[in-house]
Amino acid sequence: MSSAAVAASRRQSCYLCDLPRMPWAMIWDFTEPVCRGCVNYEGADRIEFVIETARQLKRAHGFQEGRSPGPVGKPGKDMQSINHAEPGSRPPQPLDRYPLTSDRPPRLGAEYQRQANGIPVPNGFPKPDEPPELNRQSPNPRRTGAIPPNLVPLVNGSMPPVHALNGRSVQMGIPPGALAEHVGKRADDMKDKHRADSMSDPSDGHKRVDEWTQKGKTVREMMTLQTLDSRFKKEHAALPHRMSYESSSGALKTDRGKHSRGIKRKTSPEPDGEGIAVKLNGEGQPWLPSPSEVLKMPSAALPGFAAAPPSTISPHSRTTPPEAATAVQNSQSPMAALILAADNAGTGSPKDAGNQVHSTTTSAAGRRNSGSPQSPSAGQRRPALGATGTAHIPGMDPQAGHPHSIPDSSVPPSSVPLCCTLCHERLEDTHFVQCPSVPSHKFCFPCSRESIKQQGATGEVYCPSGEKCPLVGSNVPWAFMQGEIATILAGDVKVKKERDP
């Protein structure tokens, strides 16, 4: 590395980013001088590949690789050997450092390769009789045989087709007519011989010639490298998703009829409402006779439509058999099952909870309907519901003579409805008084207000149930705080019930 000390007083140009760097920011351990930023960005294991690709691009596009004056102290004999051509040939111009004209007849040796446009260019291997190639102000010569083994296929003929910039084919030393004929002939061959490991498509090169020339040198080099990685990463990543998704969707294509909406295939399938509707409404469930019956079903019975907007339900609309209701209950979310288990733990066994629900909803419905008789189908369905342990939601009440809306979506489907312990009225999910000791003690605001007035708002006011429920872990009964009493006794608080218009 003694040559590095000679050039230490001047800034060095990085081979990749083409920026002047201080000597301490340069790394001389590779075939070309590169800065630490490029090595960190590309990685030390891939930097040789990037350098070789940049070298190929610079030569193919005719970039001037040596801006600095020639190396100091080089004898004239060595300087003449750079232009090792016939004695009568002219010296090359700055852009013709690697002459591509007829001064040097194309050879088919290991150091030349034919590009897709028919232009023979050096492939990166130095000739034995050439002097060390100096790039910019690089103090070290390019080492012979430093190309990694994985670059041999790239160097020996798998480079992408190179297109002349701005159509400057005359500068390359080939007549336009011959170039057009040659390119046309090679275009047909490329359709058959196009390899999967080429870095860019010919059509992409034609489209982006203008964009390519407007971008900086470093951007052009990096874009060429990233074309290969990004394209194959996308295609290979999408392939297993596409195969598995289409194979799994083959079972859904049996006979959708008018339910199929032409769902577009995606590389990463996302759950959407239409796909769930097709599965639920398909022929795999024979107990759904027609789509009209599905429209009558309560949305709470379908897991995919738990948050559907409120709809009108007819009194004789429940067509779900008991076993299907049990399956729906088992397929709900863990949170809904947890809430249901907590409510059942407070009221006793699930069967007792079901009976309690039926009794409370019966009395509440009788009060709502002003003595209207219940439909005969209501009594027939109750034993089946009690046997399966499925909770009965008042929004699905068959004895209701007028339409009721579905309860708030925050209440999980098939959970025990909230009813006041004293008057058994339906409670709103957020506006009621909950006893902190007994989970089954739930009271509406009117009952709580009456209880507070009976106990006397000035003294200690205990649970509206009339019991002195002790706090958890102690024998001290809980009592209302003054702020809670004031809130409950406020006369302007009016909770809207379901029966209100």
Curated annotation (Swiss-Prot):
The record's annotation in SUPFAM superfamilies points to: RING/U-box
Q: Which parts pass through the membrane? A: none
Where located? Nucleus
* Biological process annotations from GO: negative regulation of macrophage differentiation; regulation of transcription by RNA polymerase II
Give me the stretches of Basic residues compositional bias: 256-266
Q: Zn finger regions (RING-type) covering which residues? A: 420-467
InterPro entries (alphabetical):
I2BP1/2_C3HC4-RING_sf, Interferon_reg_fac2-bd1_2_Znf
Question: What GO molecular functions are on record for this protein?
Answer: DNA-binding transcription repressor activity, RNA polymerase II-specific; RNA polymerase II cis-regulatory region sequence-specific DNA binding; transcription corepressor activity; zinc ion binding
Query: What UniProt keywords are attached to this protein's entry?
Result: Metal-binding, Nucleus, Repressor, Transcription, Transcription regulation, Zinc, Zinc-finger
Q: Pfam families from the xrefs? A: IRF-2BP1_2, zf-C3HC4_IRF-2BP1_2
Region Disordered, as annotated, extends over 60-155, 240-277, 306-330, 344-410
Give the CC-aspect GO terms. nucleus
Biased-composition ranges for Polar residues? 311-320, 356-378
Keyword Transcription applies: yes
Q: Where is this region: Cys-rich?
A: 420-467
Database matches in PANTHER family: INTERFERON REGULATORY FACTOR 2-BINDING PROTEIN 2, MYELIN TRANSCRIPTION FACTOR 1-RELATED
Q: Tell me the function of this protein.
A: Acts as a transcriptional repressor.
Please state which protein family the record places this protein in. Belongs to the IRF2BP family.
Instruction: Name the chain's protein.
Output: Interferon regulatory factor 2-binding protein 2-B
The organism encoding this protein is Danio rerio
